[in-house]
Amino acid sequence: MATSDSIVDDRKQLHVATFPWLAFGHILPYLQLSKLIAEKGHKVSFLSTTRNIQRLSSHISPLINVVQLTLPRVQELPEDAEATTDVHPEDIPYLKKASDGLQPEVTRFLEQHSPDWIIYDYTHYWLPSIAASLGISRAHFSVTTPWAIAYMGPSADAMINGSDGRTTVEDLTTPPKWFPFPTKVCWRKHDLARLVPYKAPGISDGYRMGLVLKGSDCLLSKCYHEFGTQWLPLLETLHQVPVVPVGLLPPEVPGDEKDETWVSIKKWLDGKQKGSVVYVALGSEVLVSQTEVVELALGLELSGLPFVWAYRKPKGPAKSDSVELPDGFVERTRDRGLVWTSWAPQLRILSHESVCGFLTHCGSGSIVEGLMFGHPLIMLPIFGDQPLNARLLEDKQVGIEIPRNEEDGCLTKESVARSLRSVVVEKEGEIYKANARELSKIYNDTKVEKEYVSQFVDYLEKNTRAVAIDHES
């Protein structure tokens, strides 16, 4: 295996195994982290299922050893479903059930190869105890923001038992008592209603996360100290485990300018004035209603702003739901709007000089990508940690959340249009633009990013179980 000059000769080469959850929003950061560890001269084994590995072929570094796993069949899933993109959100619990069925194969790998470290995702609640019994050091790498993890519960035991003391709507819509500082990070009433479609029989995410946190030697956070000043120490206090920031792992803009999809979109963007276009993308796995899509579309129309909408037909709250754009919308906005209905090269679009703002669902990956390019955010969070992310970002004044009806979450075209214009046109938006530009300097500081990676790998080198045993003997 190729090695990097950055590892000192007298240090042992580690074998690190990484095992993400079956969602590309998790798989890609895990793959990126694996590559960075390998570039420091360590052996890395990346574990995922066969079909996902095939779909990753263009992303996999030759430095990484790929371990293909066979996902067990689960009756409720389509035959080739191996990632969250392959299923409706209400079927994700069955994908987790299938993922749990990987336990025997992963255990055999650990027994046969004895890695020094195993880095795993929140879903793999069964893994820490197995790794511990084999003398393997254990780390949970969270792609979820640290404030969202802290919001889940005051301790791993509380998460496991489902007993964090929050029993009323008021409890859930105010910052929890274990937050020792003022913050706006909390759900609102309409956010709670959105959690219901995602609940299903089986093992809860809180139980999974609690066992993962309780069984880990450390927690790896996709964050900077500068952005998680209060939150990283809070996580250490709540869970009594070292929290190691690994940096933001910002993705690289692809270099192939001849990609047919990008050529078409770029031609359209090139025809627009610099700093005039809003990019709209709500992710490919969120549940949105027909009413929300209509109000969002009509709000874009009402705003009068040029836009590119990455509109991969959204999934409705039920599998039978059909979600459509309003009649005549595409034709009426054809001169200033581009509705792109297949996969869109998000990084390239955000990097184009005509783009001036990003209407986003506030997934953690999209936040990084938007702020990398200094774009203020117009935030439309849908579920889970997305509302928590939006509240924190609004508090940091890098954008605003589109107002909804507090009780039922209803969206209006007027609130969409007003929010868009407030951020990218009106004078009040200057503060959001300035703060987003300042954050982009941090997000694009390659020296700082490399320092985080070096410190993280140094932590792995100094804190393996083998090192601890050597020190004791």
From Swiss-Prot:
InterPro entries: UDP-glycosyltransf_plant, UDP_glucos_trans, UDP_glycos_trans_CS. The active site is at H26 (proton acceptor), D121 (charge relay). The keyword Cell inner membrane does not apply. An anthocyanidin binds at H26, G384. UDP-alpha-D-glucose binds at A344, Q346, H361, S366, E369, D385, Q386. Pfam families: UDPGT (PF00201). Keywords: Glycosyltransferase, Transferase. It is an enzyme of class 2 (transferase). Its EC number is 2.4.1.-. It comes from the Eukaryota. It catalyses: steviolmonoside + UDP-alpha-D-glucose = steviolbioside + UDP + H(+); rubusoside + UDP-alpha-D-glucose = stevioside + UDP + H(+); stevioside + UDP-alpha-D-glucose = rebaudioside E + UDP + H(+); rebaudioside A + UDP-alpha-D-glucose = rebaudioside D + UDP + H(+). GO terms for molecular function: UDP-glucosyltransferase activity. Involved in the biosynthesis of steviol glycosides in leaves. Converts the mono-glycoside steviolmonoside to the bi-glycoside steviolbioside. Converts the bi-glycoside rubusoside to the tri-glycoside stevioside. Converts the tri-glycoside stevioside to the tetra-glycoside rebaudioside E. Converts the tetra-glycoside rebaudioside A to the penta-glycoside rebaudioside E. Leaves of the 'sweet herb' Stevia rebaudiana contain a mix of steviol glycosides, compounds that are unique in the plant world because of their intense sweetness and high concentration in leaf tissue. Stevia leaves have been used as natural sweeteners in South America for centuries. Belongs to the UDP-glycosyltransferase family. This is UDP-glycosyltransferase 91D2. It comes from Stevia rebaudiana (Stevia). The lineage of its organism: Eukaryota, Viridiplantae, Streptophyta, Embryophyta, Tracheophyta. The gene is UGT91D2.
